[in-house]
Amino acid sequence: MALVQSQKIVLVINSLQGGGAEKFVLTLGEAFHQMGFEVHIVRFDPIVEHTLSENLIYHLIPFRNYRRLPKGKIRHFFFARAVDGYINKHIGQPVAIFVNLYREHEVFYYSRQKKVAYVIHNQLSEKLKLATLPPKQLSYFQRIYTKYPAICVSGGVEQDFVRQFGEPTKTTTIYNPIDRDNIRVLAEAANPDLPAITRQGYLIHVGSFKAQKGHEILLQAYANSAQTLPLVLVGKGNLQAQIEQNIIALNLQDKVILTGFQKNPYPLLKHATGFVLSSHFEGFALVLAESLALGVPAISTDSPSGPSEILPPQNLVAVADIPALTEKINLLMSHPSQFNVPFNEAFLPLNVARQYLTFMGVDCE
């Protein structure tokens, strides 16, 4: 403990809104703190939707102050200089800086900080639509993503990264941390009020209302199912109005329940009969692993990365295969125990944190 007590680690994220990458940063930061490091969370947007631990040190460097500069490279160049200056003055020299998500990657491309690694949370070919971009823009991304080592949150994400950018930089796969003990404590909180139809059980999906998550596939598959249990959707996002319209069009108003975003979704998850993930693509599928931490049976679409590294083949269906997903939903409602999967302790935060430090050459003994 004393060996690393004065050593500093920085995790960079755009905001602390209620998403998986943001939760990842807080969980990993807490693990580094438990190992004796001084942990700094640097964000560019003031939004906070997660509960913040007092063990971590939080910094806000507002990106909005630079929006009056020309969009793109110039804006990111000058903002990167401001970030460098802030870190040097207010934090000092970290032993590692882990930079999450695309905007932050673009900013740090112009940074002069040392000991930086990108964390790649999604298949960039899908997230950035690389196949549709002109050569000049592709070249720009090539320069960004070959500047620093890259830590990918699943094997599928690493394969996609290497396929897109080659191997001029060091890469590895390290799964996301899942704080099983804390999740189980949080799951003991009072379950939010749900309609009476959920008393005999319900299926649940937790995720942002955006195209990646495939709500249209889930709703159609559920509409085609026996509907013996209601479906609870936890989340918010820019597709909420469209999802609500789909629910009406499929005549599911009495069967599908929208709870909105939940800062603590774990009581809802714990009491569910089963969890369903319907994504077109994922990085790691954090909530899938969280459902296993609570002993909740789970099924998922077999998106190119993430789910197949968490669930066995019998729990998976092809992406956008509505009949196959309907069949799995029916089985999940009638025989949920068929889809029980043990939690993988490789996901525990201290195990993950040690891998991060080893990758960066930081002594964590």
Residue ranges of each PLM-predicted region?
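A conserved mid-protein helix/loop that constitutes part of the nucleotide-sugar donor-binding site
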Residues: 22-27, 201-224, 238-244
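Aromatic "clamp/platform" in nucleotide-sugar-dependent glycosyltransferases that forms part
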Residues: 261, 280
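A charged, aromatic-enriched C-terminal amphipathic alpha-helix characteristic of glycosyltransferases
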Residues: 20, 334-365
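Conserved acidic donor-binding segment of nucleotide-sugar-dependent glycosyltransferases
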Residues: 312-323, 330-336
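N-terminal strand-loop element at the rim of the active site
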Residues: 6, 11-19, 23-27, 31-73, ...
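A short, active-site helix/loop in glycosyltransferases that binds the activated sugar's phosphate group
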Residues: 107-108, 147-173, 178-182
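Short His-centered aromatic/hydrophobic patch
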Residues: 98-105, 120
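Membrane-proximal helix-turn-helix segments that form the acceptor-binding/catalytic region
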Residues: 85, 132-152
